[in-house]
Amino acid sequence: MSNTQQLHDFTTQVRRDILRMVHAVNSGHPGGSLGCAEFLVTLYQDVMKRNPGFSMDGKNEDLFFLSNGHISPVFYSVLARSGYFPVAELATFRKLNSRLQGHPTTHEGLPGIRMASGSLGQGSVSYTHLRAHETEAD
């Protein structure tokens, strides 16, 4: 999707999702999510090589490491609208037994999530570890 208007429309829908999710449960951090909307939409729709079919190994696709897990509303919306899981699931955000909690985790098997994110800054460490492991494997 490289059409500027399409990216704008996609981003507008993501922002609506963020506000609906956070408002429905009266919990979450809308500011960070709203501020990252263009960035994540552009990455997932125009820059990254990705696979909504998803496998944990991430072969033949670009990997995204989310450090600040409190922006999960934008991450969940972009993943859902990119085909990783049904958009209707966004309505379960932060509800009991939902896969969409306040910080993304891998234990619920949510497509598009490869690592739990909680501590700020852990994404850069995870990426560095992955690159070091790939270098050793070569």
Tell me the role of every PLM-derived stretch.
Residues 6-7, 18-21, 33-131:
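Cofactor-binding active-site loop characterized by glycine-rich and histidine/acidic residues
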